[in-house]
Swiss-Prot record:
It comes from Thermobifida fusca (strain YX). Its main location: cytoplasm. Its EC number is 2.1.2.1. This is Serine hydroxymethyltransferase. The keyword Ribosomal protein does not apply. Pathway: One-carbon metabolism; tetrahydrofolate interconversion; Amino-acid biosynthesis; glycine biosynthesis; glycine from L-serine: step 1/1. Keywords: Amino-acid biosynthesis, Cytoplasm, One-carbon metabolism, Pyridoxal phosphate, Transferase. Pfam families: SHMT.
Length: 423
């Protein structure tokens, strides 16, 4: 047997025990802890299987029926399924399922619709926006003239009057509605009105809340926007990747911007996993999971607004949530964001530190937390479980917390909802 054929048939554990051991350790971590990073989720086993198939071997530059390589008849079927399912799920006229990530999807939209130096208007990163919406250190802030709108200091909500005033002043070519850390629904009708008043195109980045949209629990931006981008993980719960939805008249530009504009060969194994995830997202089981996601976030926000939490300097930004995440302001707490993240990690809950508007601390420290419920809802958590998690978090962020007791409560919840049994 040749060395080549040996490597072709060996298992991961046989061929590379170091990587296999790290993968096993990560599976154990996911099983034994509570994942509450708002952008993370657990992909269905069928999604994992699709992504681990022989499709990883296939190059397929181009689009279904128009490839630059032979032997694409089967990947054409899969990619067309993904396209059709995305269009049906969100009511879109056009879908491109090839972007490798949400950032790549946003890049492709800019490449398709804008020229270097054009003006864009997006939510300030420090107020909950995203790097790709015009941050100065990101390509979007280097190549484009980025103007930022903000949330109001009084209530933490987007100031739509400011959005309108800035749009009239700067005449952006593209207005971006979307966020990475904002706990309320967006007023897409108002954004559309402002775009129409100023002759701008409207892009909605729904990466965080796409799953809620699919389940009918959040307004659908597709009827309002010229282009919608999203990731396929987060609340959608699929593989890590991107997706673009657009009006039909923009479809050719979008496709050309993705390939050959920004990418070469698409990742057909990931596109297959996207197709599977989009099928799941059209099911009642998925909608029920999203209802628990939303309910869990509201339960968490309610617990963290109780008097004992307030006395510990804990404040919920905007006073609550309409989505899958809660933003916690710790400016008046004994903890900064990094310390709070570490404390929760110590007891087995994974979250991420997050800047709050006008944060006095540096980005690697911050004064806040972003806490999400999608992964736990996928794991099967219901209202009673979320109430227990919320109380554990509240107790952990207060002075004099009992790490051992709280860790035991976390372990009990993890054991109650086993993850990937038999994997």
């Amino acid at each position: 047997m040749t060395a080549q054929s040996t490597s072709l048939t060996q298992s991961l554990a046989q061929l590379d025990p170091e990587v296999a051991a790290a993968v096993d350790a990560e599976l154990a971590r996911q099983r034994d802890t509570l994942e509450m990073i708002a952008s993370e989720n657990f992909a269905p086993r069928a999604v994992l299987e699709a992504q681990g198939t022989v499709l990883t071997n296939k190059y397929a530059e181009g689009y279904p029926g128009r490839r630059y390589y032979g032997g694409c008849e089967h990947v054409d079927v899969i990619e067309q399924l993904a396209i059709d399912r995305a269009k049906a799920l969100f009511g879109a006229e056009h879908a491109n399922v090839q972007p490798h990530s949400g950032a790549q999807a946003n890049t492709a939209v800019y490449f398709a619709l804008l020229q270097p130096g054009d003006t864009i208007l997006g939510l300030d990163l420090a107020h909950g926006g995203h790097l790709t919406h015009g941050m100065r250190i990101n390509y979007s802030g280097k190549i484009l003239n980025a103007v930022a709108y903000h949330v109001r200091e009084s209530d933490g909500l987007i100031d739509y009057d400011e959005v309108e005033a800035l749009a009239k002043e700067h005449q952006p070519k593209l207005i971006i509605a979307g966020w990475s850390a904002y706990p309320r629904q967006l007023d897409f009708a108002r954004f559309r009105e402002i775009a129409d008043q100023t002759g701008a195109l409207l892009m909605v980045d729904m990466a965080h809340f796409a799953g809620l949209v699919a389940a009918g629990l959040h307004p659908n931006p597709v009827p309002y926007a010229d282009v919608v981008t999203t990731t396929t993980h987060k609340t959608l719960g699929g593989p890590r990747g991107g997706l673009i939805l657009a009006k039909e008249e923009l479809g050719k530009k979008i496709n050309s911007a993705v390939f050959p504009g920004m990418q070469g060969g698409p990742l057909q194994h990931v596109i297959a996993a996207k197709a599977v995830a989009l099928k799941v997202a059209a099911s009642e089981e998925f909608a029920e999971r999203q209802r628990r996601t939303l309910s869990g976030a509201k339960i968490l926000a309610e617990r963290l607004t109780q008097p004992d939490a307030a006395e510990a300097g804990i404040r919920v930004l905007t006073g609550g949530t309409d989505v899958h995440l809660v933003l916690v302001d710790l400016v008046n707490s004994e903890l900064n964001g990094k310390e709070a993240e570490d404390r929760l990690h110590e007891i087995g809950i994974t979250v991420n530190r997050n800047a709050v508007p006008n944060d006095p601390r540096p980005p690697m420290v911050t004064s806040g937390l972003r806490i999400g419920t999608p992964a736990l809802a996928t794991r099967g958590f219901g209202d009673a479980d979320f109430a227990e998690v919320a109380d554990i978090i509240a107790e952990a962020l207060k002075p004099g917390f009992d790490a051992a007791t709280l860790r035991s409560r976390v372990q009990a919840l993890a054991a109650k909802h086993p993850l990937y049994p038999g994997l």
